[in-house]
Amino acid sequence: MSKTHKNKTLASFLAVVLGGFGAHRFYLKGPLDRLGLLHLCALPLTGMVYGIAQEADPFFKLLPLIVSYVVAFLEALIIGLTSDEKWDAAHNAASGRTSKSNWVLALLLVATMLVGCTVLIASIARLFDLLYTGGAYG
């Protein structure tokens, strides 16, 4: 019995779009993946921070979700830059098919770098603004 074939482009896309909730981990490893569940815990944790610290800056309220998405962007790059041979050995050993990456994956990785680096740099800048000036610059 052959297993389903795991698509590297789809896994990278899930990591970029829904990675903050662990969708890529659940696609690759199943519904009980511990790191996927850790990603999923970012949403209730964000809700708890919002409920407990209502007077806090919105950046701090969204920080668990921001961290989860930054990690997911990194995972999208790792997934997308894995060679097809290593990908098939790790995820498609019993599927009977081989993977072949195309230009869609390359565009997705470029977009991931653009968005991921922007989010990371903006988060670091806002964090230092809040910690050192109390939010005086915005």
Provide a role label for each language-model segment.
Residues 1-10, 14-36:
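Membrane interfacial helix-start motif at the N-side
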